[in-house]
A protein has these predicted regions:
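ATP/NTP phosphate-donor binding region
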Residues: 1-62, 300, 306-314
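Catalytic core of DAGKc-family lipid kinases
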Residues: 6, 31, 40, 80-194
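Glycine-rich beta-strand-to-loop/alpha-helix junction loops that act as flexible
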Residues: 9, 65-67, 91
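Active-site-proximal cofactor/substrate-binding loop regions of enzyme domains
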Residues: 63-65, 72
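Short Gly/Thr/Asp-enriched flexible loops that form oxyanion-binding sites at enzyme active sites
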Residues: 70-83
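Glycine-rich phosphate/pyrophosphate-binding beta-alpha loops
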Residues: 136, 140, 197-211, 276
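Gly/Ser/Thr-rich active-site loops/lids in small-molecule metabolic enzymes
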Residues: 151-161, 212-232
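ATP/nucleoside-binding phosphotransfer catalytic cores, i.e., glycine-rich phosphate-binding loops
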Residues: 183-185, 190, 215, 225-314
């Protein structure tokens, strides 16, 4: 098997990438293993590199070292290639998908990653692009959009960028977006929503537990929709929402589905694993067992994940 490490030098403002590259070289030193380190050079490079190696037909384990954008690109690059597996080495913004597996330390350990097992997981097809973690539309997508702008500033950390983005979007005359939403082919339901989330895993947005029951290999997606509420109620709601303790709130709807679609009269920001675009409509659907995801040795496997992994373990 070949091991390809795609390292985004810009992720996390470049703090950890040299350490990761050194750790990779140190681990493989003296071993008769085929490995390669590539520093990505621009947007889309990780996707092209991943697809290029997958197209050779060689069995390959690709590690995306960066933020959610790097992982998103690599996952789309190996779409449809059974010979390719994807692992994640966190060194950028969020990496919320990994929170499902508990402590992130095994994901930073090169030996643990190389010796890990690859399990089939589901993905979300979001307007023709694949997402590991989740998608959203509404206020939180607006926050993600503005966070990407703030975090480019030299003295602004990821957490500070998030706080600034929240403040910018909170102080608006009216919260939420007008959307018509359909689930599993049902009728479109029109309303004003604070946000809507379609999730493959529990956490997104820097640690918000917006889909508490989501399991990334259970063959179903989790949908959360929150009606627009007055400004004064938002801080208390977000506190509960971050902990995943909002199921009893009358203005929150949760269900499980395989498809979701929204339509808007005006273009609204859509978040796809941290990548933002402006759309007037989009469909989201389950892609069952669409990716072999590397869980490093020593990482926690939740019981629900293990139950499903027994069916499709690589």
């Amino acid at each position: 098997m070949k091991y390809l490490f795609l390292i985004n030098p810009a992720a996390g403002k470049g703090k950890y990438q040299p350490e990761i590259a050194d750790a990779v070289r140190k681990y493989f030193d003296g071993k008769n293993e085929d490995f390669e380190i590539v520093f990505t050079s621009c947007a889309g490079d990780a996707e092209q590199r991943a697809r290029g190696i997958a197209e050779t037909g060689e069995r390959v384990r690709i590690f995306a070292a960066g933020g959610e954008g790097t992982v998103y690109e690599a996952a789309n690059g190996i779409r449809g290639f059974d010979n390719a597996e994807l692992g994640v080495i966190p060194c950028g913004t969020a990496n919320d998908f990994l929170k499902y597996f508990g402590d992130a330390e095994p994901f930073r350990n090169i030996e643990a990653q190389v010796n890990g097992k690859a399990f089939y997981i589901d993905l979300i097809d979001a307007g023709g692009r694949l997402c590991l973690n989740g998608c959203s539309v509404g206020m939180d997508a607006m926050v993600a959009r503005d966070m990407n702008l703030f975090k480019r500033l030299p003295a602004v950390s990821g957490s500070m960028a998030y706080k600034l983005a929240v403040l910018r979007n909170f102080f608006t005359p009216r919260l939420g977006v007008e959307l018509s939403v359909s689930v599993d082919g049902g009728e479109l339901k029109k309303g004003r929503w604070l946000f809507a989330v379609i999730a493959n895993a529990p956490y997104y947005g820097g640690g918000y537990k917006g889909a508490p029951t989501a399991v990334p290999n259970d063959g179903i997606l989790d949908f959360t929709c929150v009606e627009a509420i007055p400004h004064l109620r938002v801080p208390k709601f977000l506190s509960r929402y971050k902990r995943g303790e909002f199921s009893e709130l009358s203005y929150c709807s949760q269900l499980r589905c395989s498809r979701m679609r929204f339509v808007s009269e005006r273009a609204v920001p859509v978040n796809r694993d941290g990548e933002i675009s402006e759309e007037t409509e989009m469909s989201f659907s389950l892609c069952r067992d669409a990716l072999r995801f590397v869980v490093p040795a020593g990482a926690a496997l939740p019981d629900a994940f293990k139950e499903n992994a027994n069916i499709k373990k690589f």
